[in-house]
Curated annotation (Swiss-Prot):
Subunit structure: Part of the SNARE core complex containing SNAP25, VAMP2 and STX1A; this complex constitutes the basic catalytic machinery of the complex neurotransmitter release apparatus. Recruited to the SNARE complex following binding of the SNARE complex component STX1A to STXBP1. This complex binds to CPLX1. Interacts with POPDC1 and STX4. Interacts with VAPA and VAPB. Interacts with WDFY2, PRKCZ and PRKCI. Forms a complex with WDFY2 and PRKCZ. Interacts (via N-terminus) with KCNB1 (via N-terminus and C-terminus); stimulates the channel inactivation rate of KCNB1.
Biological role: Involved in the targeting and/or fusion of transport vesicles to their target membrane. Major SNARE protein of synaptic vesicles which mediates fusion of synaptic vesicles to release neurotransmitters. Essential for fast vesicular exocytosis and activity-dependent neurotransmitter release as well as fast endocytosis that mediates rapid reuse of synaptic vesicles. Modulates the gating characteristics of the delayed rectifier voltage-dependent potassium channel KCNB1.
Gene name of the encoded protein: VAMP2
Domain v-SNARE coiled-coil homology: 31-91
Descriptive protein name: Vesicle-associated membrane protein 2
KW GTP-binding (keyword) present: no
CDD domains, per the entry: R-SNARE_VAMP2
Cytoplasmic-side positions: 2-94
Amino acid sequence: MSATAATAPPAAPAGEGGPPAPPPNLTSNRRLQQTQAQVDEVVDIMRVNVDKVLERDQKLSELDDRADALQAGASQFETSAAKLKRKYWWKNLKMMIILGVICAIILIIIIVYFST
């Protein structure tokens, strides 16, 4: 090795060509502010999410109430329909009996009229 190579100044570390580095306190404060801003953003997002969850819960409760009311109405309709069906079945049966009696009377009249 030559003597000039030994006396050459050491190579500058990469990145030292720009402005001087900020003091460590300033860098810490900047990082702290960035972190605080991120935390604030996350808190805002979580507040919005909680509000949405509460709205969803309220809507689900309303939907559940409406479903219960609909179920009660359906049950009442089913009962009313069964009663109405039975009522008209009896009316139909009465009509068939009356029609049968009328046919029997007409048949008896015809038999009596032609047998003499």
